[in-house]
Structures are given as structure tokens and as C-alpha cells.
């Protein structure tokens, strides 16, 4: 048996024999823990540790403690080795670096816009991520993950989630081009118009921002109420970005949580603001040849565009694009312009004028300035471009400009059959705006027939009545630059137009020459002078001369005109003066000698047509006001 007399006890301060056994058990426990830690680090678990190597001097564990269980082996009070092992192990674990592969096409999605995505991953996992600058032509790219094992595993998990989220979904396939992919997402039917936008503006902006191609697929133009697939084609990462942008657009617009300015538009970025413009005032904002809107754009440093619409709303939306402060300045300029027009209107605005951001109000004001009329001609082949299918184009132009546009079905005499006459009625601004829209449709300028003519005191159209004397001239201005002295046109199949200052068709183009007014000195050279003389004699005498007594036995037979068309008989109880009027015209025609050498039948004879017209007028005025129109022809002059 070994001699242990020279070995000092483990602890001199222990009382009794039980204290030494407890210390030995604690030492055994510490030794066992050290072996376990060494095994984790990579050492041999069976290697025994020499206590002398760790500063225990000549202390030796008593042999009697060898058979004690490990649970009683605790480290001694002066054991510094056991306290240092956990920090050493933690320090070794914090410098772990691992290479991780990610798909090359998903790198941009992992990094995110402005590096937001990768910054979030590093912050949540506590792991540093470094991505190789390129893949070297391989389908995967290397990422170096540095951190503790737990942080590295967390970073891997987050990266896998992002890659899985960006993987092709059902309906996603690679396109024909290299690196292109196609994905289809379903858009609710109620949001399809929101994604497309007015005139396709929204979907174009999405394509430009994401760098992809988007196509909304639908079976036909009719709205079936079913969801529509949106096909996105492009780089896989860009396709995913475009998908997120579309979903964000639908989500934002559906919630109506945008911050809006005083004009009701969203604020932020360079999106600009939308300003509602009364439809009749659109021409005022645009100005003649676009001068006003160009001036506003130059002064404010913005871009102004009118959004297309269906013409059902009373206002049109002017979209102002640019910096927020400049957009606000341009909106104020437009508002001031409209206010000045409103204040200058003779009728004045109605109650509740439009306030800036304080309700919509109501203009209740007519178009500024007097109504004018503008005639122009276009080649027959381009008439369809102005009218459109079912009249949609001309209706749209009329709604956008606020002017009334008509195609004259009955052109003036001697008109060129290859040209068509159009008439625009409205304010100068409306006429100018409508003219611009028409010129855009036909791809060139129109051929005007004189400046716009205002409706003066005699300017209210009537039911195909005879023309009156020309109304007073209009003051010269930007929309009426030249003096204008029109003459009455020749008689038309349905009678002359109403008594207003008519435009002359012969002052601009020779192929629309009009008939000159009758001149007494040249009466012998005009075959229609008899009709004009009768007309003027009747016109100037209808108010001054009282109607004479109706002669007895006046004929009431049915007459026919020179073209063989049967005329309607006079109403029952009314006196028919058709024969008397015909005799009057015949006498007037015989009083004026025909020019020498004039070919017979060179000009049509409208005597019968005029007689029928005056007979109808006599019947009409006799029913409404017996004193309103003379019931007999004037006495032939010079007879």
C-alpha cells in the first residue's frame, strides 16, 4: 500500500474527516467538466489532465476519492481554469465565417432598393453578409457570412425566405429572350382601370420605373366583371419588383389614406398635383395656339397636361408635374386666371364661387365673351377623321372644347364638291381649342372662311327665315383681327339662313365664291335680281305696311315648283297668294332685260321656291299672329 504520510491534506481549514471528502468530490467534478469541454473543442475526452500544469503545485487528489461519483466533484475555490474555459470557447465561436450560395438572379432582390433588404437581414440576424461582385458566369453567387453560429444560421434562414419568396410562382416562366422571365398576376376587375390609368398612363409609368413590359390580358373590350391577368415580362428581379409595385398601387388606392393638398391631389415626390378646370374654361387656360399654357409652364417651371376623360364631368383635370413648390405656384396662376375671367364676365358668377380647397363651389357662369361662329372647309376625304365612327370624334371634340361643331349639309351655291363646310360656334377660346383638336385629327391646318363672326342683335338663328341686313361690326381683337363686311349668300334649297350677320364664303378661297348682293346699277346682269328685289321689298315693308283685305275668291289650288315637286296646299281657311307672288316675280323678271348673249337657263330660277317659301311663312304667321306678316305682295316697282 502506498505511503500517503507525506501528502498534506487538501484543506487545512476543514474540520473532521467529512470536509476533505467534499473538496475532493468537487475537484473530481471540475475535472470531469474540463474533459467534457475539451471534447467539444476537439481534444481527446479520455486524456487525463495533470493538475500540476494548471498551478496546483504538489497537491494530489487522495486515492480514496477515486471511487466517488462525478456529481460530487466540484471545482475547488481557487480553480481559475474552469472559470476561463467558457469565455475562451465563446471567443472562438464569434469568429466563424461561412460561404453561402444564393441564385445570381436573386442578388438584387436580396440587396433591395438602396440596400434596405440586406441591412434588415444583418440587423435581425447579427451576422455580417458580404456578396461577391459577380458570379463569374455561374448560376449562383457566393456570400460570406461572418458571425456566431447562431447568427450565421439565422442569416441563412432569412436568405432562404427571401429567395423562396422570389422564386417563380405559378404562371411564372422564362421568356424567349436570355434571362427574361414572365409572370402573370390576377388583377381584380374593379382595379384593372386603376392599374391601366387614363389613356394607359399608369401602366406606362410602371413599366418605365420597373424596366419591364406589362400587358393586361382580356378577352374583349366589354367589361365582364372577371379578374384580369396582368402579364409582366423582363428580368426576374425586375419582374418581382414590378409585381410589388402593382400590388402596392392597388393597396394604397384601395385604402384612400393618401395625404392630399388643397386641390385634392396627393402630395409627395414629383408626382405633381391635379387642378380641376371648368370645361368651358379649358380654352382660356390653353390660350390661342397654346400660348397661355406655355407661358404658365415657363413662368412656373412645370409641365401641364390635361388628362383625357369621357366628357361626362363638368370639369377637366389639369395635371401639373414638377417640384411641389412650383406645382403649387402654377396652380395659383391658373386659379387667378380663372378668377379674373370670372370677375370680368358681365353675368358674374353665381353664389358659392369656387374656393381654394374649401369645397367645390359652383361657377354658375356662362362662357366669357360673346358667342362667335367660325366656318372652315376640309377635303371630303378627311371629313371622316373629324366626325369619327358614329360621330364619336366630333362629339368628343365638342365636349372637350365646349364649342358646338356642325357639318353643313347644305353648302352654299357654287361650292366645290370635293370640300366640306364645318361650323364652330362658341367663345373665341372654345373655337380656338376646337380648331386645334380638329387640326390634330386631320394632321394639318384647316382652311378658314374669314374670322369668327359674333352673334349680334340679328344673330339668333331662326327657322330658315330670310336673311336680314348685316349686323353691326365687331371690335377688332385677337380673335377678330380684320374688319369684315360680309354679303348675303344666295338662296339655298331650304331658304336663306336666319337674319344674322352671315359670313361670306368668297373672301378666302375662290372655290367657295358667293353670290354678290343685288346692285340696282347691275340688275340687268343678274338673273336672280328679281328674287332679291322681291325679298328686300318684302323685308323692309313687312313691319310698316298693314295687311290689306283679302281678295275674294283667291285661289287655293295645289302648285308645283320648277322642279316638278308638288307643293302642299294652303291650310283650310287661309288665303293662298301663291299665284299673286308668282305674277309679281314674273313682272319683276320681265322688267329687267337679260344680258346680251347670255345662254338660256344659265342660272336656276328660284321664283317658285321663293313663292312656296313665302306661302308657308304666310300660313305660319297667320296662325300665330295675323298682323305679323303681310298677306299680299308689294306693288312692283316701276310698273
From Swiss-Prot:
PTM annotation, UniProt: Ubiquitinated. This targets the protein for proteasome-mediated degradation.
Main location group: nucleus
SMART domains: KH
Disulfide linkage: none
Chain positions with N-acetylalanine modification: 2
Residue(s) carrying Phosphoserine: 48, 51, 135, 625
Alphabetized CDD domains for the sequence: KH-I_FUBP1_rpt1, KH-I_FUBP1_rpt2, KH-I_FUBP1_rpt3, KH-I_FUBP1_rpt4
Amino acid composition bias (Pro residues), ranges on this chain: 463-500
Keywords annotated in UniProt: Acetylation, DNA-binding, Methylation, Nucleus, Phosphoprotein, Repeat, Transcription, Transcription regulation, Ubl conjugation
GO cellular component, one term: nucleus
Biased composition (Basic and acidic residues): 61-73
Subunit structure: Found in a complex with PUF60 and far upstream element (FUSE) DNA segment. Interacts with PUF60 and JTV1.
Protein name from the UniProt record: Far upstream element-binding protein 1
Organism listed in the record: Rattus norvegicus (Rat)
Recorded name of the encoding gene: Fubp1
Amino acid at each position: 500500500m502506498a505511503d500517503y504520510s507525506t501528502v498534506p491534506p487538501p484543506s487545512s481549514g476543514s474540520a473532521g474527516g467529512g470536509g476533505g471528502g467534499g473538496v475532493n468530490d468537487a475537484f473530481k467534478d471540475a475535472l470531469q467538466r474540463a474533459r467534457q469541454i475539451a471534447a467539444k473543442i476537439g481534444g481527446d475526452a479520455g486524456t487525463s489532465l495533470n493538475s500540476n500544469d494548471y498551478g496546483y503545485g504538489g497537491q494530489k487528489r487522495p486515492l480514496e476519492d477515486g471511487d466517488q461519483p462525478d456529481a460530487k466533484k466540484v471545482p475547488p475555490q481557487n480553480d481559475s481554469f474552469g472559470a476561463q474555459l467558457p469565455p475562451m470557447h465563446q471567443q472562438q465561436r464569434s469568429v466563424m465565417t461561412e460561404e453561402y450560395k444564393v441564385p445570381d438572379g436573386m442578388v438584387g432582390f436580396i440587396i433591395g432598393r438602396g440596400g434596405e433588404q440586406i441591412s434588415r437581414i444583418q440587423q435581425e440576424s447579427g451576422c455580417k453578409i458580404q456578396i461577391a461582385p459577380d458570379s463569374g458566369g455561374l448560376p449562383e453567387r457566393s456570400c460570406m457570412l461572418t458571425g456566431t453560429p447562431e447568427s450565421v444560421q439565422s442569416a441563412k434562414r432569412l436568405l432562404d425566405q427571401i429567395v423562396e419568396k422570389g422564386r417563380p410562382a405559378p404562371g411564372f416562366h422564362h421568356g424567349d429572350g436570355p434571362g427574361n422571365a414572365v409572370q402573370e398576376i390576377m388583377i381584380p376587375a374593379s382595379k384593372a382601370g386603376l392599374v391601366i390609368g387614363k389613356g394607359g398612363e399608369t401602366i406606362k409609368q410602371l413599366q418605365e420605373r420597373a424596366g419591364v413590359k406589362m400587358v393586361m390580358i382580356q378577352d374583349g373590350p366589354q367589361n365582364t366583371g372577371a379578374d384580369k391577368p396582368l402579364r409582366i415580362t423582363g428580368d426576374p428581379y425586375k419582374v418581382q419588383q414590378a409585381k410589388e409595385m402593382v400590388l402596392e398601387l392597388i393597396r394604397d388606392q384601395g385604402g384612400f389614406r393618401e395625404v392630399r393638398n388643397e386641390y385634392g391631389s396627393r402630395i409627395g415626390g414629383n408626382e405633381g398635383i391635379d387642378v380641376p378646370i371648368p370645361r368651358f374654361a379649358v380654352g382660356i387656360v390653353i390660350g390661342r395656339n397654346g400660348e397661355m399654357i406655355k407661358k404658365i409652364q415657363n413662368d412656373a417651371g412645370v409641365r401641364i397636361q390635361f388628362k383625357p376623360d369621357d366628357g361626362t364631368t363638368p370639369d377637366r383635370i389639369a395635371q401639373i408635374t414638377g417640384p411641389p413648390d412650383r406645382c403649387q405656384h402654377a396652380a395659383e396662376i391658373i386659379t387667378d386666371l380663372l378668377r379674373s375671367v370670372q370677375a370680368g364676365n358681365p353675368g358674374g358668377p353665381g353664389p358659392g364661387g369656387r374656393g381654394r380647397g374649401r369645397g367645390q363651389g359652383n361657377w354658375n357662369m356662362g362662357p366669357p365673351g360673346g358667342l362667335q361662329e367660325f366656318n372652315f372647309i376640309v377635303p371630303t376625304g378627311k371629313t371622316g377623321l373629324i366626325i369619327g365612327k358614329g360621330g364619336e370624334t366630333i362629339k368628343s371634340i365638342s365636349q372637350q372644347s365646349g364649342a358646338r361643331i356642325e357639318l353643313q349639309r347644305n353648302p352654299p351655291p357654287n361650292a366645290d364638291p370635293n370640300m366640306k363646310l364645318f361650323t364652330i360656334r362658341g367663345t373665341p377660346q372654345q373655337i380656338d381649342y376646337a380648331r386645334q383638336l380638329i387640326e390634330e385629327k386631320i394632321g394639318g391646318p384647316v382652311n378658314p372662311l374669314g374670322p369668327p363672326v359674333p352673334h349680334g342683335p340679328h344673330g339668333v338663328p331662326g327657322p330658315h327665315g330670310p336673311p336680314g341686313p348685316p349686323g353691326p361690326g365687331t371690335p377688332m381683337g385677337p380673335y377678330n383681327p380684320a374688319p369684315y363686311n360680309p354679303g348675303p349668300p344666295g338662296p339655298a334649297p331650304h331658304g336663306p339662313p336666319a337674319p344674322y350677320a352671315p359670313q361670306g364664303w368668297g373672301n378666302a378661297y375662290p372655290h367657295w365664291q358667293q353670290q354678290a348682293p343685288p346692285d340696282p346699277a347691275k340688275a340687268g346682269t343678274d338673273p336672280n335680281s328679281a328674287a332679291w328685289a322681291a325679298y328686300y321689298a318684302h323685308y323692309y315693308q313687312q313691319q310698316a305696311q298693314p295687311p290689306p283685305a283679302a281678295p275674294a275668291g283667291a285661289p287655293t289650288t295645289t302648285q308645283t315648283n320648277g322642279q316638278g315637286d308638288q307643293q302642299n296646299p294652303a291650310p283650310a281657311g287661309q288665303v293662298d297668294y301663291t299665284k299673286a307672288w308668282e305674277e309679281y316675280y314674273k313682272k319683276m323678271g320681265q322688267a329687267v332685260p337679260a344680258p346680251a348673249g347670255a345662254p338660256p337657263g344659265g342660272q336656276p330660277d328660284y321664283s317658285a321656291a321663293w313663292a312656296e317659301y313665302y306661302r308657308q311663312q304666310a300660313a305660319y304667321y297667320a296662325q300665330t299672329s295675323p298682323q305679323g306678316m303681310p298677306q299680299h305682295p308689294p306693288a312692283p316697282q316701276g310698273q
